[in-house]
Amino acid sequence: VQFKVLASFAVVLASSLTAALLRAAPPAPGPQVDITSPADHSRLAWQARGSYTVTVAYDGKSTRFDEIPSSNVLLAATFVADTDAPAARRAAPLPEALVHVTQSNCMGCHDFNASSGGPSFAAIGKRYAGQPTAAATLAAHIRNGSRGAWGSGSMPPHPDLGPAQATAIADWILAHGADPAVRYYAGKSGSFRMIAPGKPGPRAGLMLSAYYTGPLKSGATRNASGRNVVVVTGTGS
């Protein structure tokens, strides 16, 4: 009897220690994201284009050596009224819908702001704005494909995206696709444009925030370390 009691106690103790270790285990490290250009606190004329470069390191891989696809990097250019304000450095979390967009082949035909093989997300958001069934319609187009919605072209189906993922993308397009204060650019390098939603003041500019959108290891988050936010002040308004 004493042996059984000791054995039971040992099992309970081992279970408690295991649970404690699991609770104490630190979360898996997130990505290291650095905007290497433009320089922080740089200045650029409104309406001008500036170049950007982002490096991402995660799970022993890096964009420097093309081990992480360029499509797994996203840059957001957000208008800020005062580049010296603390809020100008508080980047919003990356919407999960944009993770789905960049991990699928959406960017092969769609751009955020310009027409390419298909309409831009901004144009789609404007066309369907205010329509009560817009989210369901867009989600169905994403999952099942469509024909004739934008001229004579057709959109292929995306069965790799589940209903919840397609709905999240549709909701984002309707709520934020045509937001004049934020523009998104896919890729580890490229160009952004200094655009303001209205007449900018003398302290206004853009907050550039970079994100890793690729797959994560179990327990990891997208909370990035590194210089993933820089501010560019607009000139010549």
Label each residue range with its predicted role:
Residues 50-52, 58-62, 69-79, 158-184, ...:
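C-terminal capping alpha-helices of c-type cytochrome domains
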Residues 91-114, 126, 136-139:
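Sequence/structural segment immediately N-terminal to covalent heme-attachment motifs in c-type
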Residues 1-6:
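N-terminal secretory signal peptides that target proteins for export/translocation
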Residues 8-19:
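Bacterial N-terminal signal peptides
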Residues 108, 117-128, 141-170, 181-192:
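Axial heme c-ligation environment in periplasmic c-type cytochrome domains
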Residues 22-53, 57-59, 79-87, 232-237:
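Short, compositionally biased P/S/T/A/G/V-rich stretches that sit at domain boundaries
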Residues 25-28, 71-74, 79-81, 90-91, ...:
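Short beta-strand elements
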Residues 38-44, 180-200:
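Signal that preferentially marks extracellular ectodomain short beta-strand elements
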